Amino acid sequence: MAIRRWLLERQKSTQAATSDDDTLSPLRSAAAAVTATATATTAVPPTLQDSAQAPSSPPPKRQRVIVGQQWQQPDSTRKVREGQVECQNDRSIRNPDSTDPRRGHSDLDAVPVIHLQGEANCLKCFRYRVQKHKDVLFVKASSTWHWACGNGDKTAFVTLWYKSQEQRAEFLTRVHLPKGVKALPGYMSAFV
């Protein structure tokens, strides 16, 4: 806005000077033409011409779910519909036809495992001793691990994977566990 006023004042002063000095009038008219084209090309947009008008506010944010409130505006950035779980694979999560009573409704691709629980160094030594029989006794062995949160118990775990329940049962009958080590049988999803 200030630039526009300055240009108008300059044009008025140029016109007044033209009447005083007719010899420079061709140059001044050319300068006025250049100034007029510059004003036309650098015109201020109509939305910003009125200095009293404030710039528009950003779009409103998506509403959050409030306790007791049952609806939320849909998240347009996600492609998963409400009630669905986003997953990298399309495998079935549960097997309702499972016949194993211990497994209940377990994953279709769950493998039998044993979590060996005990003192960390004892578990490492045990894993090293049974490693030479790996092909017969188990498929995989994990490193020693601990729970990150909880009651602060320093108990360590080593997880052994098996091809079948029969291989796991054979392991439990053939191998003598060291004193202080407990075997916790279970199933884990095969994420290999």
Swiss-Prot record:
Location within or outside the cell: Host nucleus
GO terms of molecular function: DNA binding; DNA-binding transcription factor activity
Listed Gene3D superfamilies: 3.30.70.330
Extent of Low complexity compositional bias: 38-47
Bias type Basic and acidic residues, positions: 76-106
Listed GO biological process terms: regulation of DNA replication
Keywords: Host nucleus
SUPFAM superfamilies named among the record's database cross-references: Viral DNA-binding domain (SSF54957)
Classification via Pfam families: PPV_E2_C
InterPro entries (alphabetical): E2/EBNA1_C_sf (IPR035975), Nucleotide-bd_a/b_plait_sf (IPR012677), Papillomavirus_E2_C (IPR000427)
Ranges for region Disordered: 38-106
Keyword Glycoprotein: no
GO cellular component: host cell nucleus
Job description of the protein: Plays a role in limiting the replication of viral DNA in keratinocytes. Recruits the host NCoR/SMRT complex to viral replication foci to mediate repression of both viral replication and transcription.
Family: Belongs to the papillomaviridae E8^E2C protein family.
Protein's name according to its UniProt entry: Protein E8^E2C
